Regions:
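Conserved catalytic cores of phosphodiester-cleaving nucleases, focusing on short active-site segments
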Residues: 102, 106, 127-156
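Catalytic cores of nucleic-acid endonucleases
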Residues: 145-200
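Polyanion-binding and phosphate-handling cores
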Residues: 116-122, 138, 149-151, 176-179, ...
Length: 326
């Protein structure tokens, strides 16, 4: 049962000190491991809220077939699948590191009093944070974007230097504006730009067993989130600290959904490269149709944004966000 033991050991390390996720696949692995170690199936089934008969049958299959008794496709995992899972973990880890930097910036600018942020990441929606005033009333919502990979041909195709070019999917701009209109709360994209820091760079130190376990469990979001949380703990964090140190607050910039939409309409054919390519969707099947913005000219530094907010009345500032001044 070498492969099944590898999976249980990886999960045990990922989940050390954390509650067991509610994902059924994870509970089945951990429960079967306990039965295979000699515990009574009825007791274990009760602990994991599983059917005793089904759990015992699963343990018997694993004993006979190793990991194939749990996931018949386990021997079909390819290097391409592993690379995809590693990339997904890395992208989520980059987002988590960016959010930590932003929390520090907010506290630095406001002293933790005039403004505060409300964490909405656990809700898994398009809102990462809401910015609240001193009375707890929302001023705007933030959607955090990490930008590292450069568009090398940006100058030729959209008229911007590669290091100053930020792509944002056009459908995300549309969704953000619709959300703003529905809830009457300004929607703001918070962008952390670190040129030439890509998910590939971040993915290299991720333990192979973590990546493999995620692939075996079909990329379950709760497992991916647990891996990221584990990598941010003290024993793993030193591996990623050099990357974390490349995220100075000066690289944080913001753009409201309204301003992004206005610029999209004004420069549709100049900045949406996909519209100038015949058969774009056929040539780049999984590519998004992006609008490209100038980081330095069209986005506002986050520190400037927060300082202006502290100086102005929150109500007036919210109106300016709503109409696209920033």
């Amino acid at each position: 049962m070498r492969d099944f033991q590898r999976l249980t050991q990886a999960l045990a390390d990922i989940l050390v000190g954390s509650p067991v996720p509610q994902a059924r696949e994870v509970r089945l692995v951990l429960a079967a491991a306990r039965v295979l170690h000699g515990e009574r199936s009825d007791t274990v089934a009760l602990d994991f809220k599983l059917q005793r008969r089904g759990l015992q049958a699963l343990a018997d299959r694993i004993r006979a077939e190793d990991l194939g008794g749990l996931v018949p496709y386990a021997d079909q995992i390819t290097p391409e699948m592993l690379a995809k899972r590693r990339q997904g973990i890395a992208q989520m880890l980059l987002g988590a590191l960016a959010e930590r930097r932003f929390e520090g910036l907010i506290n630095d600018v406001t002293g933790g009093g005039v403004l505060r942020i409300e964490d909405h990441r656990p809700s898994r929606t398009d809102t990462d944070y809401r910015l609240l005033n001193g009375n707890g009333n929302p001023i705007c919502r933030f959607n955090v974007k990490f930008h590292g990979s450069l568009f090398r041909e940006a100058r030729r195709h959209v008229g911007l230097p590669p290091e100053d070019c930020f792509p944002l999917a056009t459908y995300k701009i549309n969704q953000a504006l619709r959300r703003q209109e529905q809830e009457k709360l300004p929607y703001v994209f918070l962008v952390l730009s670190v040129p030439d820091l890509s998910a590939t760079d971040v993915g290299r130190p991720i333990p192979d067993d973590y990546v493999w376990a995620l692939a075996v469990l079909r990329g379950r979001m709760v497992v991916e989130e647990a891996i990221v949380a584990r990598l941010l703990r003290d024993d793993h964090l030193p591996l990623f600290r050099p990357l974390f140190n490349r995220m100075p607050e000066g690289q944080f910039r913001v753009i409201s959904a309204k301003k992004a939409d206005r610029l999209l309409r004004e420069m549709l054919f100049e900045r949406v490269h996909a519209l100038s390519l015949k058969g774009f969707t056929r040539k780049f099947r999984n590519a998004e149709v992006d609008m490209h913005f100038s980081l330095t000219q069209e986005l506002t530094p986050a520190r400037t944004f927060l300082e202006l907010l502290v100086q102005e009345s929150p109500q007036r500032f919210a109106v300016r966000l709503y109409i696209g001044d920033y």
